[in-house]
Amino acid sequence: HSEVIFRGDSPTGKFTPWKNNPILTQRQLDAERPNPVTCAGHADLVQTREGDWWAVFLACRPINNTFENLGRETFMMPVKWSEDGFPYMTQGDDLVPVIVRREGVKRDESATFGNFEMNDGFDGQTLGMEWMTLRAPATGLYSLSQTPGYLTLKCDSVSASEKKVPAFICRRLQHHKFECSTRILFCPQSKAEQAGILLFKDEKHQYFLAVGRDDQGECISLRQIGDGESKVLASVRLDDGGVLTDLKVVSRGTHYDFYYARQEGVWYVLCRNVDAGYLSTATAGGFTGTTIGMYATLK
């Protein structure tokens, strides 16, 4: 990936390319460099009120120089100017920095980048802006008022493997290493009913940590969902008569660990060392990244 620039006397041309194109790229750099930023491109140039020029562009942060699950993220860099009047961000072995510091700008408590913790009790009238649904607003598939203090999902006859609108409330992964947990109040009445945490890359690449039922009764399972198939990676029987279940996903960057609890704080391992690369751009294609959230289905 790269960004190149041309200059012309009018919007209709003729256009002359800069002799030192590209003005932004990382493709020629050592893949084993520390903290690499890759796939840089799609840049826009903006000017501040002070007259400074900055570039806003897309790029990726791979884990261990192998794959990424974060999609192409938004980066910023100050723009430099060549002696012959062309703007550029990198030349030669210049690195795109992971963090750019600008005088007068500091991080505050509302920052949604870097390391942070977010808890949502779903006690408002609307979902926060960080939450999203697939393709459409999912009207009628969730409620914040049916049980105050809970997000209520409808077990609908649509699955996240279809290009439709499932009962899936999710947010984008922002870190390779993270922990995500939820408390679920759910008593499945049939083998079709399932609810839990879904890691979703696309219709053919998912992990589903779910409370459900099988022939022997209520259970918790981890499924790897692929192209027209679903494989159970782990399952455990629930025979304690409880209705509350805590579910947790811990990402160590290259692998996921999945946990469950029926008593607060008493966590049990369901499955460890699950390949995070299954949800990556390298495996699934695309640059949209992985999402994670609460999901319910009848399929």
Language-model features: locations:
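Carbohydrate-active catalytic/glycan-binding domains of CAZyme proteins
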Residues: 1-299
